């Protein structure tokens, strides 16, 4: 076989004698004593909530970088590591993007040029509602968003961005940052405004994966909720 840069040799060596690709055991975090308790991790999973109300405040650059650094450890198919992560990390830029999206949606609706797409009825009205009263149905007044794309020739082109955002979200919520999986922004960019993608740093070589809003929440959840379990089938093979 050939090396795909996943570094299990570095991670497994009991004496820390392996160095590879410029990394040594001294650069790494020991696992013993540093893994969270299962109950704590379970509470984080259960306490994760979608946030649709945000403070108008930039997330500090240092904290944002910590979230991005943690999410970089999300697995990718064949360890390809070809993700492209676009972050709108300033409220002023987010406001400009928000305004541009709604103005274009309103223009498409007014001229009858709205493409036939998923959530078309929503997009037909979104620009008008924004102009009339500032209703922000797509961005939920979030101060930031992160948009993840993957190389079109990646082994797991659709799966990798979703795994990345799952890592990003859990670390964000562990640090008091609210998040929202934003399907409306994803569908808008994919189906209605694909010409926005280059300005968001996504070239033709990459496929849009998904989008997530984030920022300091203006509400605080106090407890977990009760949810219905997934349908589980235990399979025997005789």
Feature roles, as predicted:
Residues 1-238:
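Acidic, surface-exposed loops and disordered segments
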């Amino acid at each position: 076989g050939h090396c795909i840069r996943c570094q299990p040799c570095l991670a497994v060596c009991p004496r820390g004698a392996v160095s590879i690709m410029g990394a040594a055991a001294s650069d790494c975090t020991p696992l013993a004593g540093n893994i969270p308790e299962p109950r704590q991790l379970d509470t984080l999973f259960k306490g994760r909530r979608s946030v649709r109300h945000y403070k108008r405040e930039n997330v500090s650059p240092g904290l944002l970088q910590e979230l991005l650094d943690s999410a970089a450890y999300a697995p990718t198919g064949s360890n390809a590591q070809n993700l492209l992560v676009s972050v709108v990390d300033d409220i002023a830029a987010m406001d400009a993007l928000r305004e541009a999206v709604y103005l274009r949606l309103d223009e498409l609706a007014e001229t009858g040029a709205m493409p036939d797409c998923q959530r078309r009825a929503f997009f037909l009205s979104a620009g008008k509602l924004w102009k009339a009263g500032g209703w922000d149905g797509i961005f939920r007044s979030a101060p930031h968003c992160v948009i993840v794309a993957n190389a079109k020739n990646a082994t797991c082109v659709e799966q990798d961005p979703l795994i990345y955002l799952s890592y990003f979200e859990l670390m964000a919520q562990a640090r008091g940052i609210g998040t929202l999986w934003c399907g409306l922004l994803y569908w808008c960019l994919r189906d209605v405004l694909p010409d926005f993608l280059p300005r968001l740093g996504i070239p033709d070589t990459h496929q849009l994966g998904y989008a997530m809003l984030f920022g300091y929440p203006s509400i605080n959840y106090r407890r977990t909720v009760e949810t219905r379990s997934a349908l589980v089938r235990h399979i025997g093979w005789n």
